[in-house]
From Swiss-Prot:
Disruption phenotype: No visible phenotype under normal or hypoxic and normoxic stationary phase growth, nor in mouse- or human-derived macrophage cell lines. One of its GO terms (biological process) is response to stress. This is Universal stress protein Rv2028c. Belongs to the universal stress protein A family. Disulfide bonds: none annotated. InterPro entries: Rossmann-like_a/b/a_fold, Universal_stress_UspA, UspA. One of its GO terms (cellular component) is plasma membrane. It comes from the Bacteria. Induction: A member of the dormancy regulon. Induced in response to reduced oxygen tension (hypoxia), low levels of nitric oxide (NO) and carbon monoxide (CO). It is hoped that this regulon will give insight into the latent, or dormant phase of infection.
């Protein structure tokens, strides 16, 4: 079926790793809340020329089927009313996921793939996807303490960009879904011209639009002197999700890079990168 004709779904990159299964379980609530399918996508890396002999292709297909079956079973065990689809492709994982993102509502991946064994380093597929996908992307890390209204925050930075309304909409929807409070931060650098009043005024206008739609979501604003990454490091495990704009390439690159990933990994914090396509 042509990708553009597929109905929207929540796509999860499966690669046989535990983080991929955790991403699938995290994505169950996303699919259930939207009443759309959850699609488990495994991409078989093409062989180098001359390597396909001796049953290598058959072994790769068997590994793909086993990985998808395991993830499917884990999702079924969650016992949620979600339709689960399965797709196995023959191309590089990042290529396959970016292609799928054109028709997806959200693409979810684990922070560490099967070929990356250092927890402080984000997988190359996840990093490339965050910067190139055509839909929102979640790089999932399981939180290390129970998520509750008073336990862990969803953090979003309000920087005065034109897509702050989209960001706040995404944050409020996630907060209701995850039963979490929201902290909206504005970051200022020492010695930089003060545009904080304008940013806060814009933020207040957007919050006035969104909060009546989500009266059950607790929202707190915070002014931060310094970098977003330093602020997140200080929060530690009291934050379980950070939401960034896809247009904020500097911070996206920072948080999928080594320093940012180390902070998010220690906290067990999911990164959600949102563009104008958020549903």
């Amino acid at each position: 079926m042509n990708q553009s004709h597929k109905p929207p779904s929540i796509v999860v990159g499966i690669d046989g790793s535990k983080p991929a299964v955790q991403a699938a379980l995290w994505a169950v609530d996303e699919a259930a809340s939207r009443d759309i399918p959850l699609r488990l996508l495994y991409a078989i890396e093409p062989d180098d020329p001359g390597y396909a002999a001796h049953g290598a292709a058959a072994r790769k297909l068997a590994a793909a089927e086993n990985a998808v079956r395991y993830a499917f079973t884990a999702v079924e065990a969650a016992d949620r009313p979600v339709k689960v689809e399965v797709e196995i492709t023959q191309e590089r994982p990042v290529t396959s996921l970016i292609r799928a993102s054109a028709a997806a509502a959200l693409v979810c991946v684990g922070a560490i793939g099967v070929h990356h064994f250092r927890p402080e380093r984000v997988g190359s597929t996840a990093a490339a996807l965050a910067l190139s996908a055509q839909c929102p992307v979640a790089i999932v890390r399981p939180h290390r303490v129970p998520i509750g209204r008073d336990a862990a925050w969803i953090v979003v930075e309000a920087d005065g960009s034109s897509d702050i309304g989209v960001l706040l909409g995404a944050v409020m929807a996630e907060a209701r879904l995850r039963d979490s409070p929201v902290r909206v931060v504005t970051c200022r650098q020492s010695g930089v011209g003060d545009t904080g009043d304008d940013v806060r005024a814009s933020l207040d206008r957007w919050l006035a639009r969104w909060q009546p739609r989500y009266p059950d979501v607790r929202v707190q604003s915070a002014a931060v002197h310094g970098e977003l990454l330093d602020y997140l490091a200080g929060l530690g495990r009291s934050v379980h999700m950070v939401v960034l704009s896809a247009s904020d390439q500097e911070h996206v690159e920072q948080l999928v890079g080594a320093p940012g990933n180390a902070v998010l990994q220690e906290a067990g914090c999911t990164l959600l990168v949102v563009g104008q396509q958020y549903l």
